[in-house]
């Protein structure tokens, strides 16, 4: 059919045989066939063992055998395109966290993400041709309506089989959706996406569905094709198999999933009857024998294939494959085409670029256009299962236990991964990685992003730091940071920080007794215990600024030397340990923000570390009443080395897990943590594990201790290049490798991961701008490179 624009250009509508919807999920074609399409999420493959992938391939072959019918055809499409759904609006408490999120999305993610969409199409043909001539004679008799009803029943039966078999792949049958009172055809939108590589809404119209799809002008030539839209134009080229690979394997075309440009991979498979299939194999064998072909092994395999076909180990079909690559201009198209062609050739096929058949190859991408297929070939259902894996990179989850995803990362395939902090309702996370690889930066980034989950829920984040690495992030987000140092006022004053409640009375009695008995000289007498209870009651009745350990001591016996008062004296202000808990003010605020504690200098000072931990965790525990709460600990192995601190933490964590709390831990080598009974228990409870690359990873620790698979261990030790800023996220629901490269956000990295020199530099800026609590931050981000070692 000639187009209106000239004698050499055809109207695109003649290639679009779609009449319209018979129902929400079924479309009628001009030749009387009916069609149904599903979008498939795909299953993760990157870190999966080959045995599982082989099993899926066998299961797909079994499905094809079960639905084999010469009146049925299957199309499989992979569309890699740039229409990535936007993240949900994000709301933060602090200006810095909002700025960090915006910078990350604009500098790291913007323009760097593509999406892989798989589509599966089933086409059921009428038992007899229902073309235009046939319809004239059957219109009045009603036979066509009966035949069509039978086709629809057949389609639904087939669809139930397919949907059941592919349930694990995330199959979503396309139909009609409504938005703001307007009906849109999802099937039409999928067809248009296959045609153009770009998503555009397609409304339901009263006329031809095909006409409603063709809204952009397509011009085909021998070198390529051009698609002209009202906004712009872009070009494409199509590649096909000239010769098939000698062998097929699961996911053999998966290299296309990670290319950094749009493409459309089309495959069709029309079942052959068994006599037709045997004839194909016999003809090929006879041709090789009559020509004196010396490929004896191949001839023998053809004979084996005939036996397998007779045994129903597979079925055969007419297969067609094409790859359409898109670019903005011809120069870019040449480079992209060469790269795509190389990826396909790596699968073992001989790949050619379409020339004179470009127009037919382009339109053959659309389901139902069998007459335009170029270079079809007969293959087995096993081969087809290898070509069509429906494998993909994980997408994460748009929402979880605490609401919408808090961050988006980029996978190895350049696709978006939406990160939620929970696996089901468990928010226990462990991060492992060698020093300097970025684990602290990632942990602090996650803590900043968690503001979204806290802002409307009065939630709290508590962070136990090591060497002040997270101090700048805590201060930048308006939080409180206490660096506890031996011999200087700690900011911990339990008598002044606790309210006058029964819980405070009980805690202080046990806590003061522990202080007294920490000298190893035994317990206190019943009389001293009664005096202590009265003293605590009296102290808590005062205003906070009037309370002190020294004042409490007045209620106890000062002599003899083994008396409780005498033993408590060293903890009073002005004495050896008075700096620890008897200061002028208690600085533990725990308001709806982030509070950081650096106990690095106390970890080896067991006498102070244990009661400090007990007080902090008591204060934290009071916040855990069902409200959202996050406890995070950097280099937590150092905390585990203190047995008293470990004991307090172990008891405390049970409360966290039961009351909507989260735990995020980070450390360098897992083997050091696994040696600790508490560490091993903690890691086992962490449903989310994040690994940075480690060339020295210990096999026993990662596989036996952390339950990594062989593929995951290989990725950690070999595949993830050190310094690439990639991490492996492991969960029961699946594993994925993501990028976290902030090389274009140096000023934010300086805040997320503090070093000794940058912490000192920031402290000087804060001192210079005393009274302006937030002014130091912008100056620091502008001048962080001036920090001297």
Curated annotation (Swiss-Prot):
Keyword ATP-binding: yes
Organism domain of life: Bacteria
InterPro entries recorded: CagE_TrbE_VirB (IPR004346), CagE_TrbE_VirB_cntrl_dom (IPR018145), P-loop_NTPase (IPR027417), T4SS_component (IPR051162)
Pfam families: CagE_TrbE_VirB (PF03135)
Signal sequence coordinates: 1-38
Annotated binding of ATP, by residue: 433-440
One of the record's GO molecular function terms: ATP binding
Keywords: ATP-binding, Crown gall tumor, Nucleotide-binding, Plasmid, Signal
Homology family: Belongs to the TrbE/VirB4 family.
Function as written in the Swiss-Prot or TrEMBL entry: A possible function of virB4 might be to provide the energy, via hydrolysis of ATP, for translocation of virulence proteins of the transfer of a T-DNA-protein complex across the agrobacterium membrane.
Name of this chain's protein: Protein virB4
Species: Rhizobium radiobacter
Upper classification of the organism: Bacteria, Pseudomonadati, Pseudomonadota, Alphaproteobacteria, Hyphomicrobiales
Gene name for this UniProt entry: virB4
């Amino acid at each position: 059919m000639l187009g209106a624009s000239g004698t050499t250009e055809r109207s695109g509508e003649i290639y679009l045989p779609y009449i319209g919807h018979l129902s929400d999920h079924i479309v009628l074609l001009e030749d009387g066939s009916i069609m149904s399409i599903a979008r498939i999420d795909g299953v993760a493959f990157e870190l999966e063992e080959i045995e599982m992938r082989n099993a899926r391939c066998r299961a797909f072959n079994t499905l094809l055998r079960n639905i084999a019918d010469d009146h049925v055809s299957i199309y499989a499409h992979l569309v890699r395109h740039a229409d990535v759904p936007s993240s949900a609006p994000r709301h933060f408490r602090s200006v810095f966290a909002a700025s960090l999120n915006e910078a990350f999305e604009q500098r790291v993610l913007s323009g760097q993400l593509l999406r892989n969409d798989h589509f599966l199409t089933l086409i059921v043909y009428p038992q007899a041709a229902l073309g235009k001539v046939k319809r004239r004679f059957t219109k009045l008799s009603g036979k066509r309506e009966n035949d069509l009803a039978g086709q629809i029943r057949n389609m639904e039966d087939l669809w139930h089989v397919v949907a059941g078999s592919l349930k694990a792949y995330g199959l979503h049958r396309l139909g009609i959706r409504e938005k703001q009172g307007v009906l849109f055809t999802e099937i039409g939108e999928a067809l248009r996406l296959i045609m153009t590589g770009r998503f555009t809404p397609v409304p339901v119209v009263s006329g031809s569905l095909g006409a409603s799809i063709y809204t952009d002008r397509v011009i085909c030539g021998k070198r390529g094709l051009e698609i002209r839209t009202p906004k712009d134009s872009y070009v494409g080229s199509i590649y096909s198999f000239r010769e098939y690979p000698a062998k097929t394997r699961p996911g053999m075309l998966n290299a296309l999933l990670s290319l950094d440009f749009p493409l459309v991979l089309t495959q069709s498979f029309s079942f052959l009857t068994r006599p037709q299939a045997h004839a194909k194999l016999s003809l090929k064998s006879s041709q090789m024998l009559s020509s004196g072909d010396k490929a004896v092994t191949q001839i023998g395999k053809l004979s084996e294939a005939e036996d397998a076909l007779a045994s129903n180990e597979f079925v055969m079909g007419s297969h067609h494959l094409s790859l359409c690559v898109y670019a903005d201009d011809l120069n870019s198209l040449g480079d992209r085409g060469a790269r795509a062609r190389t990826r396909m050739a790596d699968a073992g096929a001989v790949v050619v670029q379409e020339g004179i058949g470009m127009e037919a190859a382009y339109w053959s991408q659309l389901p139902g256009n069998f007459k335009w297929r170029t270079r079809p070939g007969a293959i087995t259902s096993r081969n087809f299962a290898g070509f069509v894996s429906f494998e993909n990179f994980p997408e994460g989850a748009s929402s979880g236990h605490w609401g919408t995803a808090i961050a988006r990362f980029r996978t190895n395939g350049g696709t978006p991964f939406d990160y939620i902090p929970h696996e089901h309702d468990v928010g226990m996370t462990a991060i492992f990685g060698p020093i300097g690889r970025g684990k602290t930066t990632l942990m602090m980034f996650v803590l900043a992003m968690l503001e979204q989950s806290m802002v409307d829920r009065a939630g709290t984040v508590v962070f136990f730091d090591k060497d002040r690495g997270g101090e700048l992030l805590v201060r930048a987000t308006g939080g409180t940071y206490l660096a506890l140092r031996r011999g200087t006022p700690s900011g911990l004053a339990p008598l002044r920080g606790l309210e006058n409640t029964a819980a405070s009375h009980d805690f202080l009695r046990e806590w003061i007794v522990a202080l007294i008995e920490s000298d190893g000289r035994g317990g206190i007498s019943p009389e001293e215990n009664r005096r202590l209870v009265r003293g605590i009651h009296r102290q808590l009745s005062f205003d906070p600024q009037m309370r002190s350990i020294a004042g409490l001591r007045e209620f106890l016996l000062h002599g003899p030397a083994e008396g409780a008062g005498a033993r408590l004296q060293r903890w009073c202000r002005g004495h050896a340990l008075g700096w620890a808990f008897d200061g002028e003010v208690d600085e533990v605020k725990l308001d709806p923000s982030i509070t950081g504690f650096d106990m690095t200098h106390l970890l080896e000072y067991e006498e102070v570390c244990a009661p400090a931990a007990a007080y902090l965790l008591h204060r934290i525990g009071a916040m855990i009443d069902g409200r959202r709460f996050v406890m995070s600990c950097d280099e937590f192995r150092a905390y585990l080395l203190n047995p008293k601190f470990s004991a307090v933490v172990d008891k405390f964590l049970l409360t966290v897990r039961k009351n909507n709390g989260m735990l995020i831990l980070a450390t360098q080598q897992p083997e050091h943590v696994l040696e600790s009974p508490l560490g091993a228990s903690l890691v086992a409870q962490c449903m989310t594990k994040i690994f940075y690359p480690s060339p020295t990873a210990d096999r026993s620790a990662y596989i036996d201790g952390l339950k990594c698979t062989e593929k995951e261990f290989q990725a950690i030790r070999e595949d993830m290049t050190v310094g690439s800023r990639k991490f492996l996220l492991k969960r029961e629901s699946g594993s994925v490798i993501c990028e976290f490269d902030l090389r274009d956000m140096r000023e934010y990295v300086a805040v997320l991961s503090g070093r000794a020199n940058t912490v000192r530099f920031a402290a000087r800026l804060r001192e210079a701008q005393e009274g302006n609590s937030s002014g130091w931050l912008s100056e620091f981000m502008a001048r962080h490179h001036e920090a001297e070692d």
